Amino acid sequence: MRGAFYIAIALLVVRSRTATEIDPTDISEPYLNVVAIGGEDTRTTPKRYLRDGLAHSAANEERVKANVLSKSAKTLAAETEDWLRLSLSIGGHSHTPKSKRKVNLSPAKSQSGIRKKSTSINKRNYDKQVQADDPRLPEYLQIHQTFLKIPGMPHKMSLTEAVVMYGMVNRKVASKPGTKKNNEPLLRLMERSKWEDFENALDPMFMRLAPHEEMRKEYFHRLHTMYAKVYTFCHAHPSACTNKRAVSPLEKMIKVQKTKALLPLFKS
């Protein structure tokens, strides 16, 4: 009796091992990965084979399991890609938003550039630097010597300053001291002045201590004082300051004076 019991136990153990070798997986659990989102056909799965009672070899079973696992991995990858694409499109991050801001590629105009452009225009229109081949050079030199003799000048007048002020007093409408028409040419003269002009007009001690902007202001003030004296002198002595133009106010003053001198002769 005892021997039959041992034989039964041995048969059960052998049968259990045989079943395990045939299918190491637990067939009681459902194949969730096989019944997939992509709608895979479950008739090719090992579970279906066992349910239908079909006989199959171990090699065939391994082939079927590998096929099922590979298809499931592809399906999951495709589903993951679709979900990721959907989430990106909903979130608005699928495309990098293009910036609508327009970048101005043209260089900004600096103050130095504007000043340089303005200076070039002023120099073209008002630069009175006397050239050696200027046909009016003798006239300019003569008027320069005349202006140097005017008393009370704030500093020794340069030839350039004399030429600029000579043109100012001989305009069709003469520039009176302190007016806007007077300020503009003197301001242009100050803007294109060189360091030597400051040295000629300003005190050396003041130039060592004062900043450049203060030196410009002081020089501009001295130009105003100088022109006021030139204006007074030329209207008192028009023949010494005229440029012999009929439109010159000084020339008109000379003609008026000559007419007044001739009137008594006609009366007699």
UniProtKB/Swiss-Prot annotation:
Compartments, record wording: Secreted; Host nucleus; Host cytoplasm
Record's compositionally biased regions (Polar residues): 107-123
Domain of life: Eukaryota
Region feature Disordered, mapped onto this chain: 90-123
Primary location class: secreted
Residue span of motif RxLR-dEER: 48-63
Domain notes: The RxLR-dEER motif acts to carry the protein into the host cell cytoplasm through binding to cell surface phosphatidylinositol-3-phosphate.
UniProt function note: Secreted effector that completely suppresses the host cell death induced by cell death-inducing proteins.
Descriptive protein name: Secreted RxLR effector protein 6
Species, as recorded: Plasmopara viticola (Downy mildew of grapevine)
Lineage start: Eukaryota, Sar, Stramenopiles, Oomycota, Peronosporales
